[in-house]
Amino acid sequence: MFLLYEYDFFWAFLIISILVPILAFFISGVLAPISKGPEKLSTYESGIEPMGDAWLQFRIRYYMFALVFVVFDVETVFLYPWAMSFDVLGVSVFIEAFIFVLILIIGLVYAWRKGALEWS
């Protein structure tokens, strides 16, 4: 017997969560003024006119450091559920997680040798 009625709340929430942003964009497009005057085209910075050049150039080192951080942050997200159910899953999952961590360590060593973790 199919128990599709158990998912009614899920489908209702999914439909509502799709319709609300679509309606919000549609209503804002209908109600928003179309003309762009000089005030709309001017630069705005914290309520006052900007002083100096507004363009900043970030070094690629910050980008690489952020990328390495995101990779290891995602690693934590993947390893936490594994650690919580370690005793139930068995040895094969331990070997898979070990290989996963080994690949990440190789990536860390590569990033370290390329200088992605140096601030100077």
From Swiss-Prot:
It catalyses: a plastoquinone + NADH + (n+1) H(+)(in) = a plastoquinol + NAD(+) + n H(+)(out); a plastoquinone + NADPH + (n+1) H(+)(in) = a plastoquinol + NADP(+) + n H(+)(out). The chain crosses the membrane at residues 9-29, 64-84, 88-108. InterPro entries: NAD(P)H_OxRDtase_bac/plastid, NADH_UbQ/plastoQ_OxRdtase_su3, NDAH_ubi_oxred_su3_sf. Its EC number is 7.1.1.-. It is a multi-pass membrane protein. It is found in: Plastid, Chloroplast thylakoid membrane. Its main location: plastid. Pfam families: Oxidored_q4. GO terms for cellular component: chloroplast thylakoid membrane; NADH dehydrogenase complex. The keyword Signal does not apply. GO terms for molecular function: NADH dehydrogenase (ubiquinone) activity; quinone binding. Keywords: Chloroplast, Membrane, NAD, NADP, Plastid, Plastoquinone, Quinone, Thylakoid, Translocase, Transmembrane, Transmembrane helix, Transport. GO terms for biological process: photosynthesis, light reaction. The keyword Membrane applies. NDH is composed of at least 16 different subunits, 5 of which are encoded in the nucleus. Belongs to the complex I subunit 3 family. PANTHER family: NADH-UBIQUINONE OXIDOREDUCTASE CHAIN 3. NDH shuttles electrons from NAD(P)H:plastoquinone, via FMN and iron-sulfur (Fe-S) centers, to quinones in the photosynthetic chain and possibly in a chloroplast respiratory chain. The immediate electron acceptor for the enzyme in this species is believed to be plastoquinone. Couples the redox reaction to proton translocation, and thus conserves the redox energy in a proton gradient. This is NAD(P)H-quinone oxidoreductase subunit 3, chloroplastic. It comes from Solanum tuberosum (Potato).
